[in-house]
A protein has these predicted regions:
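Intrinsically disordered, low-complexity regulatory tails
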Residues: 94-179
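Intrinsically disordered, low-complexity boundary segments flanking structured domains
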Residues: 6-15, 85-90, 101-103, 128
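Bergerat-fold GHKL/Histidine-kinase-like ATPase
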Residues: 1-67, 75-81, 150-243, 247
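Surface-exposed flexible segments
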Residues: 66-77, 127-139, 240
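Short C-terminal domain-edge/linker segments immediately following a structured domain
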Residues: 54-57, 87-92, 145-150
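A broadly used, surface-exposed interaction patch
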Residues: 62-103
Length: 248
């Protein structure tokens, strides 16, 4: 379900009366002969360069001053499950597909549908098997209000951006470290004779964890009464980036 903020955003996008880098307007749902266009649009939106959710807003007539074309009884209308099945049946590289859903929004002059393409870090999303003119191995994206043509691939700078996004290289250091902490097996011990234990992230060794026991604090406090361990231990843990500590 669309949040109130999303609904306000959709209304604002419609009021702009132009398409953009993460939203597109369609007068009606894609008919059978235009299913390749649907897939192509979804891939382009999933690889958008804004690093955010994207929208295909269906039921807005661009040629009629962006008026609402009511979708209540529209032909070829799809539910979320139908759209998910459509995407699932296409062969994507690595089996990694865009996440999509269909939301309905009631406006004063009629009903519109919104295909929401969720933001994800598995970019670039690429077909490994062509589908009716949508080419395998082509990387499609969207720049301003234009999709990459089906017979072409994105520019190298755009492809580089999408791979950087996948590897979390677009994140600030403090955002990156929380992602790295999920990968316990990628942290290595630092040999040290001191009482402080150190580990570094092997693919970005500027990130270091330091922790040491606080023997003088060992013991129960009121919020540990439900714990089974009869001898709780306390540690000071620091996350270090190079030498400064962004968070203790």
């Amino acid at each position: 379900m669309l949040s109130e903020l999303q609904k306000e955003e959709i209304l604002e996008l419609i009021s702009l009366k132009q398409e953009g880098a993460y939203w597109d307007f369609k007068k009606e749902w894609y008919e059978e002969g235009k299913q390749p266009d649907l897939l192509h649009d979804i891939i382009c939106m999933s690889n958008n360069l804004e690093n955010r959710d994207a929208y295909i807003i269906i039921g807005i007539d661009e040629e009629n001053d962006y008026c609402v074309n009511d979708m209540t009884n529209a032909e070829n209308r799809k539910s979320t499950q139908m759209l998910v099945d459509f995407v699932r049946n296409k062969k994507f590289a690595g089996g990694i597909r865009p996440r999509v859903m269909v939301e309905t929004m009631q406006l004063e002059t009629g009903t519109i549908d919104i295909i929401v393409i969720k933001n994800g870090y598995s970019t670039p999303y690429v077909l490994e098997e062509s589908y009716r003119g949508v080419n395998a191995n082509n990387i499609y994206t969207r720049v301003m209000d234009s999709n990459t043509p089906k017979n072409k691939t994105a520019e190298i700078s755009q492809i580089e951006y999408l791979w950087k996004k996948r590897f979390r290289l677009l994140m600030a250091p403090l955002e990156q470290v929380f992602y790295f902490l999920l990968k316990r097996e990628e942290w290595e011990d630092v040999p040290d004779d001191s009482s402080v234990t150190r580990m570094y992230y092997k693919y970005s060794p500027e990130y270091v964890i330091e922790y040491a026991g606080c023997d003088d604090r060992d013991g129960y406090v009121y919020y540990l009464f439900s714990q089974i361990d009869s001898r709780p231990h306390w540690y000071n843990i620091c996350l270090l980036y190079t030498s400064p500590s962004p968070r203790d």
